[in-house]
Amino acid sequence: MRERQSSGPIVLLSGGVGGARMARGLAAVLPPAALTVVVNVGDDDEIYGLHISPDLDTVAYTLAGREGPPGWGVAGDTFAVMGHLGALGVDTNFRVGDADLAVNLARTAALRCGESLSAVTVRLAAALGLACRLLPATDDCLRTRVHTAAGEWLSFQDYFVLRGHRDEVAEVRYEGAGAARPAPGVLEAIAAASLVFVAPSNPPLSIWPILAVPGIRDAVTAAPRVIAVSPLFGGRALKGPADRVMAALGLPPGNAGVLAAYDGLLTDLVVDQDDAADVAALSRTAVRLHAADTRIAARDDAARLARYLLDLS
């Protein structure tokens, strides 16, 4: 596939699966040095004594062509360690494959030796053969916490993985965000970007944690063009709780809610072609709306959407 000559550097704000697929599409059509992916770390956690960075790893595995069939994990991974842990009486409800564990072991060892998360990420990305730049939003501890309607505060992993995001959400917080600093290179990449994309990730759970890091939202707002891709189709998420969480937090239904989630941030919003009626219905906003086929599970579809988005600029 021929590379598209971009008019300048590109930044993508990304969560997990949806963002990873959009990153894959952009990487397929851009020169490698043109793309920086800034990734959510709000769902980082400690599991089995290891520092896990699920969104960073999902993006890295997808860009490397090694993602598992659901869109996360490593394709063809084995689970021997999980079997051994289970035999020792360890709770293994949080399933991590052996190859995935190796990445988490390498990351944790480096962090404990004083290396920053961004430095570890750059090194692991190089080991996986990535050509574009992959950065965490922050090197500092920032954790998404979900307050359920039943009154419990849950870590993101407890809410999303162990409890299957079935709980009704009452509130979302980003612990540590106020004291967090953007990772080295993040603000510089955004300031240099001719175009910032917001991936079709869950706004409150994947993109808001990035924007909660002081300085990042202001940097994005100052960018000449900020284009988001809606994560909704007919008002619903294809998978995951984006629509339910947005509603629980008081955002309007459908793409009006996506606009509200990114109020004051966007120049453009791309909705799915099946929601083309929203282009006219929501045209009274200052944001330009566009309709396209935004289903990007397949590689070719992700590249097609990437070319469309770049042509908008």
Regions flagged by a language model, labelled:
Residues P31-A33, A222-V226, A286-V287:
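A short helix->loop->beta-strand "cap" motif at the edges of active sites that frequently abuts
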Residues A170-A189:
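Active-site glycine-rich loop that binds ribose-phosphate moieties when present
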Residues I210-L249:
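Redox- and metal-dependent alpha/beta enzyme cores, enriched for Fe-S-associated oxidoreductases
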